[in-house]
Amino acid sequence: MFVFIAKLLIFSSVITSAFTCYQCFIDENDSRRLCLGHILTEYNVRNVDSCYKTLDRIFNNEEKVIEAGKVGRGYDLTLKNILMAEIMPIVEEFDQQLNYDTEYESRLQAAANNFIAAASSLPRVSGCLPPCGFQVQGAVYNCVTCQYDSCEFPLDCPGKEITVQENNRTQMWCSVPFLLPADVEIVWRYAQDRTMLRERFDDVTVGVDPLYSIPSARPEQSGTYQCEVLSQEQSLVRLYFYLTVVPVAQTYHVHLQDLCAQALRPEPQFPPSFSFWLPRPALLITCLTATMLLIFLSLGAMCRLWYQIRTNVSNPA
């Protein structure tokens, strides 16, 4: 009785410490059936603990097995089927049978090699794309933890600055570089100030449209626009747009300042390339206009003088 309890304690401790890649897919009862007939060749005695150590060495702690198990989301079931196809025939064959450790070593190593070859051909994960978002398709299966590792990025993306003149059209796209599920819901929100605090925003639209458009922007529409993407009520990513609408009067004022600055800017001093000076076009036009005006005034005065002389000759005193 004492020997049985001792074996049971050893078996329980081994099961607890061996929760890694092999235990992700193979049931504990099947592992027990596999290892109960394990015989140490050197001592010709049954040793269950040595069998589990062999499983750890060949499967659970082998880097090649762990790397082969890093598949994309949705392929963990395929991974399980591959491993069970290699292990379960050995379990059924060794169940309630005594086999030497050399036989265990040979059969389990062959099963591990076959698993590595088959699992390595499965689609790999596309990878995590920084800097933000819960990237469902980017997660990778971890044989050590028996679950998918997330990309561990924050949900909030860095804000994007947008500046537009009053009465002009502006658009904001709720787009991300990673794949999204097909059942996403997009919520657009607005806050008057520059913020990322959820309580400062008011909902604007809810639907599936990734585009938010303002046909004719007004200064009072300046502020922060938030786009949140959800799937099954779980937030996947939040994008922020900091919109600044420049009033028309301010635009004209800035334009006038630029014109004045250009007019007052001194002309660059360059050594003359010719011996005579060429006037600027604007000054030349002014001079020509003044000259033509003087000519017309002179002609007018001459005509008036000629008319007066002719009148005096025709009507002598």
From Swiss-Prot:
Residues 1-18 form the signal peptide. Glycans are attached at N29, N168. Residues 123-237 form the Ig-like domain. Disulfide bonds join C21-C143, C24-C146, C35-C51, C128-C151, C132-C157, C174-C227. Disruption phenotype: Leads to male infertility; mutant sperms have reduced dcst2 levels and fail to stably adhere to the egg plasma membrane. Residues 19-281 are extracellular. Expressed in testis. GO terms for biological process: fusion of sperm to egg plasma membrane involved in single fertilization; regulation of fusion of sperm to egg plasma membrane; sperm-egg recognition. Keywords: Cytoplasmic vesicle, Disulfide bond, Fertilization, Glycoprotein, Immunoglobulin domain, Membrane, Signal, Transmembrane, Transmembrane helix. The chain crosses the membrane at residues 282-302. Residues 303-317 are cytoplasmic. One of its GO terms (cellular component) is acrosomal membrane. It is a single-pass type I membrane protein. SUPFAM superfamilies: Immunoglobulin. It is found in: Cytoplasmic vesicle, Secretory vesicle, Acrosome membrane. Sperm protein required for fusion of sperm with the egg membrane during fertilization. May regulate the expression of sperm surface protein DCST2. The extracellular domain shows strong structural similarity with IZUMO1 but does not interact with the IZUMO1 receptor IZUMO1R/JUNO. Forms a complex with izumo1 and tmem81 on spermatocyte cell membrane. The complex binds to oocyte protein bncr. Belongs to the SPACA6 family. This is Sperm acrosome membrane-associated protein 6. It comes from Danio rerio. The lineage of its organism: Eukaryota, Metazoa, Chordata, Craniata, Vertebrata.
